[in-house]
Amino acid sequence: MTHLERSRHQQHPFHMVMPSPWPIVVSFALLSLALSTALTMHGYIGNMNMVYLALFVLLTSSILWFRDIVAEATYLGDHTMAVRKGINLGFLMFVLSEVLIFAGLFWAYFHSAMSPDVTLGACWPPVGIEAVQPTELPLLNTIILLSSGATVTYSHHALIAGNRNKALSGLLITFWLIVIFVTCQYIEYTNAAFTISDGVYGSVFYAGTGLHFLHMVMLAAMLGVNYWRMRNYHLTAGHHVGYETTIIYTHVLDVIWLFLYVVFYWWGV
């Protein structure tokens, strides 16, 4: 049913979502991914097959779910002004929850760093830990991430001004900057002198930077989807709520990374 036909029968601007299998499928896929990963890490499962299967189901169901959302927003006209306000509010609540998660990780870091136990050598980083230097890859990553914030803002302003070519160029540059950031972060992890199992320092370091790393992978996927949608004329100067939320997400991750860099890489070393 198109938006025009629905308006004859529906006296409110809200989207009455049709029954969909994807929320429950994604929920069970996430549960399976968490359980299989934990069981594999603790040796209860001898291989990674269950992890790969859960990840495949999660990615496939997420793609199909996003496909339906794009169809509802672009072709069916379900995302009215009231719906877009609700989406923006929900995304802001999501961002708040992410900030609180990282606040807990910073709390854990400061709890151990400001009063290191005697078992750690009464110092921070603990005895035997060779910390990552802040003037190496982390500094390059900081420059890359701040640059991505500038290019995505440039793309957004170009889209609002109706300059499609500049909007596409800025978005594409942002996407590749995020890919480079993720690659540099992976190189840093593979060359680090400590692992997540090296005491509280390794645990809290990889928990904080690793969680940010996963969010950056998600951000790269979101930017890629928005680039595809912009190429296909799904985004207009007045209606691009998905792109707006992605831009907010980019800036939030930029700020979180600045705190991670200052605390984990500079102050903590």
Curated annotation (Swiss-Prot):
<feature type="transmembrane region" description="Helical; Name=4">
    <location>
        <begin position="138"/>
        <end position="161"/>
    </location>
</feature>
<feature type="topological domain" description="Mitochondrial matrix">
    <location>
        <begin position="162"/>
        <end position="164"/>
    </location>
</feature>
<feature type="topological domain" description="Mitochondrial matrix">
    <location>
        <begin position="74"/>
        <end position="80"/>
    </location>
</feature>
<keyword id="KW-0812">Transmembrane</keyword>
<keyword id="KW-1133">Transmembrane helix</keyword>
<keyword id="KW-0999">Mitochondrion inner membrane</keyword>
<feature type="topological domain" description="Mitochondrial matrix">
    <location>
        <begin position="1"/>
        <end position="22"/>
    </location>
</feature>
<dbReference type="GO" id="GO:0006123">
    <property type="term" value="P:mitochondrial electron transport, cytochrome c to oxygen"/>
</dbReference>
<dbReference type="GO" id="GO:0048039">
    <property type="term" value="F:ubiquinone binding"/>
</dbReference>
<dbReference type="GO" id="GO:0031966">
    <property type="term" value="C:mitochondrial membrane"/>
</dbReference>
<keyword id="KW-1278">Translocase</keyword>
<dbReference type="GO" id="GO:0005743">
    <property type="term" value="C:mitochondrial inner membrane"/>
</dbReference>
<dbReference type="GO" id="GO:0045333">
    <property type="term" value="P:cellular respiration"/>
</dbReference>
<feature type="topological domain" description="Mitochondrial intermembrane">
    <location>
        <begin position="189"/>
        <end position="201"/>
    </location>
</feature>
<keyword id="KW-0496">Mitochondrion</keyword>
<dbReference type="GO" id="GO:0009060">
    <property type="term" value="P:aerobic respiration"/>
</dbReference>
<dbReference type="InterPro" id="IPR035973">
    <property type="entry name" value="Cyt_c_oxidase_su3-like_sf"/>
</dbReference>
<feature type="transmembrane region" description="Helical; Name=6">
    <location>
        <begin position="202"/>
        <end position="230"/>
    </location>
</feature>
<feature type="topological domain" description="Mitochondrial intermembrane">
    <location>
        <begin position="42"/>
        <end position="48"/>
    </location>
</feature>
<feature type="transmembrane region" description="Helical; Name=7">
    <location>
        <begin position="249"/>
        <end position="265"/>
    </location>
</feature>
<dbReference type="GO" id="GO:0005739">
    <property type="term" value="C:mitochondrion"/>
</dbReference>
<dbReference type="InterPro" id="IPR033945">
    <property type="entry name" value="Cyt_c_oxase_su3_dom"/>
</dbReference>
<feature type="topological domain" description="Mitochondrial intermembrane">
    <location>
        <begin position="115"/>
        <end position="137"/>
    </location>
</feature>
<feature type="transmembrane region" description="Helical; Name=2">
    <location>
        <begin position="49"/>
        <end position="73"/>
    </location>
</feature>
<keyword id="KW-0472">Membrane</keyword>
<comment type="subunit">
    <text>Component of the cytochrome c oxidase (complex IV, CIV), a multisubunit enzyme composed of 12 subunits. The complex is composed of a catalytic core of 3 subunits COX1, COX2 and COX3, encoded in the mitochondrial DNA, and 9 supernumerary subunits COX4, COX5A (or COX5B), COX6, COX7, COX8, COX9, COX12, COX13 and COX26, which are encoded in the nuclear genome.</text>
</comment>
<feature type="transmembrane region" description="Helical; Name=1">
    <location>
        <begin position="23"/>
        <end position="41"/>
    </location>
</feature>
<comment type="function">
    <text>Component of the cytochrome c oxidase, the last enzyme in the mitochondrial electron transport chain which drives oxidative phosphorylation. The respiratory chain contains 3 multisubunit complexes succinate dehydrogenase (complex II, CII), ubiquinol-cytochrome c oxidoreductase (cytochrome b-c1 complex, complex III, CIII) and cytochrome c oxidase (complex IV, CIV), that cooperate to transfer electrons derived from NADH and succinate to molecular oxygen, creating an electrochemical gradient over the inner membrane that drives transmembrane transport and the ATP synthase.</text>
</comment>
<dbReference type="InterPro" id="IPR024791">
    <property type="entry name" value="Cyt_c/ubiquinol_Oxase_su3"/>
</dbReference>
<feature type="transmembrane region" description="Helical; Name=5">
    <location>
        <begin position="165"/>
        <end position="188"/>
    </location>
</feature>
<dbReference type="InterPro" id="IPR000298">
    <property type="entry name" value="Cyt_c_oxidase-like_su3"/>
</dbReference>
<dbReference type="InterPro" id="IPR013833">
    <property type="entry name" value="Cyt_c_oxidase_su3_a-hlx"/>
</dbReference>
<feature type="topological domain" description="Mitochondrial intermembrane">
    <location>
        <begin position="266"/>
        <end position="269"/>
    </location>
</feature>
<comment type="similarity">
    <text>Belongs to the cytochrome c oxidase subunit 3 family.</text>
</comment>
<feature type="transmembrane region" description="Helical; Name=3">
    <location>
        <begin position="81"/>
        <end position="114"/>
    </location>
</feature>
<protein>
    <recommendedName>
        <fullName>Cytochrome c oxidase subunit 3</fullName>
        <ecNumber>7.1.1.9</ecNumber>
    </recommendedName>
</protein>
<dbReference type="Pfam" id="PF00510">
    <property type="entry name" value="COX3"/>
</dbReference>
<dbReference type="GO" id="GO:0004129">
    <property type="term" value="F:cytochrome-c oxidase activity"/>
</dbReference>
<feature type="topological domain" description="Mitochondrial matrix">
    <location>
        <begin position="231"/>
        <end position="248"/>
    </location>
</feature>
<dbReference type="GO" id="GO:0045277">
    <property type="term" value="C:respiratory chain complex IV"/>
</dbReference>
